[in-house]
Every structure is written in C-alpha cells, then in structure tokens.
A protein has these predicted regions:
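Conserved metal-binding segment of the jelly-roll/cupin
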Residues: 114-134
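A short hydrophobic beta-strand segment most commonly corresponding to one strand
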Residues: 136-149
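Short hydrophobic/aromatic-rich beta-strand segments that constitute the beta-sheet cores
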Residues: 60, 88-90, 140
Length: 149
C-alpha cells in the first residue's frame, strides 16, 4: 500500500509539472520575407530576428555592404554562413579616425579569413570582428550569448 501511495503521489506531482515553453519557429519563407521587409529601412545590414533577450540574441543577418568593426564585451558569437562570401577580420585593434562615424571603423593587425556558405565561426567574448570585402550579399545565422564567468 505504501508503494502504491508513493507511486500515486509521484504521478500527481508529475502531472502538475508545467510543460516547457513552446519552441520558437520561423519557416524559411518567413526568414526571407522578414529580411526583404527590413532591407527597406536598413539596406546595408538588416536582420530577421528569431529571438532576442537580455542574455542572448538569435538573428539571421544580411549584409550588402561592409559595416564598421565592432566588439561585444561579455558576449560570445557563433556565425553560420547561409549564403555569400566575404572576408572576416578578427582580433587586432579597432581603428576609427577622430570624428568619423562608428560604421567607418576598421581593424589593424587582425587575422583575415575568407568565409563562404557552410562555414561556422566562433567569436570569443569581446573579440574585435569586421566583415569586409563582401562579394555580393552575405547572409548568416548569428547566435550571440552571454559569457558564463
């Protein structure tokens, strides 16, 4: 009897456990439609947001022109190239002439790599990075998450 009661209590508590939150899903068509729509207001670099919080960001990013060099202290990034090719520069020093807009920043002394469809890049927290020399449009999945210390 005690075993039956313990099993019954276990089943009742399992039945009361809330279900996990539903997953986030975007179809291929939704991603490309969102990129097309966001390109209207930001043609050089635009995104199809998948899910963004204070602790992580998941976006499909599309670049048609190089943007300025950047670093994200405290956040690690993974980029999976979906289409296009270009040069990704990492490391080195960010150079921005005094008075120049942030979008004009470049990297001096970094490592340059050609990236193309299928490539995956891990960018450590705070690492400087810059996509330059794009050969047409570069599209990639960006997963940025808070570094655990």
């Amino acid at each position: 009897v005690r075993t039956a009661i313990a099993v019954l209590i276990g089943l009742l508590s399992a039945a009361q456990t809330p279900a996990p939150a539903p997953s986030t899903y975007l179809s291929d068509g939704e991603v490309w439609a969102t990129l097309k729509e966001t390109a209207k207001t930001a043609p050089d670099m635009h995104t199809a947001p998948v899910k963004n919080t204070d602790h992580y960001r998941i976006n499909v990013v599309q670049r048609t022109k190089p943007q300025g060099a950047i670093a994200h202290p405290g956040f690690i990034e993974v980029h999976h190239i979906i289409e296009g090719t270009g040069t990704l520069v990492t490391g080195g020093s960010i150079i921005r002439p005094e008075g120049a807009p942030a979008g004009s920043a470049t990297i001096d002394g970094g490592v340059s790599r050609r990236v193309a469809k299928g490539d995956v890049v891990l960018i450590p927290a705070g690492a400087r990075h810059w996509y330059k020399d794009l050969e047409g449009t570069l599209t990639y999945l960006e997963v940025r998450f808070e570094e655990v210390k």
